[in-house]
């Protein structure tokens, strides 16, 4: 069958959605692409839809895939491919039933129950993507997107993916696994299954493991590239970092500013307490925490964040009211009527 894809949206995620649709149509149906097509796919961003909703509409021999955002449009592409029989997983993809372009599903709309769907990735373990080569880490992110995930959170411990100051000392990024060294065991089966040879880390770093400056630069480059892939795949990107209670406030501010400069891709920066809770003997009061937010991020951004919390029925840094624990209302689908 000859197929044509017409894309109205021009952003990077919409372009990626077109490439993904073409890739899987070619892979599983052997479709040819060009003029005089028997079937046309139209990819559109429809701003009348909520940003996380999507669906498709038939018009004669044309199927229009639309989403309330470019991210939702990409989700629509994967949803359609899933309906056609493609099963996506972190291990790859396969067909769970015969793939037939002649049996495309009828017009349908989708309103996901969760606006943001994704995982929180503490990239600090020898067995996770912390020890993946860059190409494999990028493909892992793409596979998450193909499974319908549109958000991801990366957590960086101090000194791992971002530098920090300890008094007068600057601790560079690239201190993987809290600065501990995890040697690869001399086991043939394990060696065949991992990409490292001497020590667990980003495999490209093994050759420069003893050169802190080069190691730091590549660590930041690696995570930045993985973030770029997540953004192309339409993901809402969060980076979380820990604030140590024993660290002077000025040093924490410096660390936050450097993180923002190193990773401009992020949509949300989370400031969290140290693992295990840390020392809470001198917690910030609500006014102090609000003042810190305004100082770090400016009045407008801080007020928007505080207002968002209030709209969700929560007072910032306060107790969650009992009404917040009630079951959420069903999703609004009135825009489809």
Predicted regions mapped to residue ranges:
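Active-site neighborhood of glycoside hydrolase catalytic domains
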Residues: 248-337
């Amino acid at each position: 069958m000859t197929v044509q894809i017409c894309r109205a949206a021009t952003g990077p995620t919409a372009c990626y959605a077109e490439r993904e649709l073409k890739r899987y149509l070619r892979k599983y149906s052997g479709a040819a692409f060009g003029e005089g097509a028997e079937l046309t796919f139209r990819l559109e961003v429809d701003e009348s839809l909520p940003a996380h909703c999507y669906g498709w509409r038939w018009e004669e021999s044309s199927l229009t895939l639309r989403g309330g955002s470019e991210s939702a449009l990409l989700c629509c592409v994967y949803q359609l491919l899933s309906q056609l029989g493609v099963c996506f997983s972190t291990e790859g993809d396969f067909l769970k039933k015969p793939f037939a372009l002649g049996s495309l599903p009828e017009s349908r709309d989708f309103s996901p129950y969760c606006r943001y769907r994704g995982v929180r990735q503490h990239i600090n373990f020898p067995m996770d993507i912390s020890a993946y080569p860059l190409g494999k880490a990028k493909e892992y992110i793409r596979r998450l997107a193909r499974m319908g995930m549109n958000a991801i959170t990366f957590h960086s411990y101090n000194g791992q993916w971002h530098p920090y100051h300890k008094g007068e000392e600057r601790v560079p990024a690239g201190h993987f696994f809290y600065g501990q060294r995890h040697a690869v065991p001399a086991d043939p089966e394990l060696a065949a299954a991992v990409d490292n040879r001497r020590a667990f880390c980003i495999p490209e770093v093994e050759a420069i493991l003893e050169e802190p400056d080069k190691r730091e630069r590549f660590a930041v480059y690696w995570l930045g590239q993985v973030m770029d892939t997540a953004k192309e795949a339409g993901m809402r990107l969060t980076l979380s970092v820990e604030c140590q209670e024993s660290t002077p406030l000025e040093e924490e501010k410096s660390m936050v500013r450097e993180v923002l400069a190193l990773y401009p891709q992020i949509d949300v920066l989370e400031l969290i307490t140290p693992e295990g809770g840390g020392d809470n003997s001198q917690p910030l009061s609500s006014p102090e925490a609000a003042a810190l937010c305004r100082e770090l991020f400016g009045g407008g951004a801080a007020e928007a964040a505080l207002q968002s919390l209030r709209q969700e029925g929560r007072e910032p840094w306060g107790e969650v009211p009992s009404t917040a624990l009630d079951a959420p209302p069903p999703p609004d689908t009135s825009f489809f009527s």
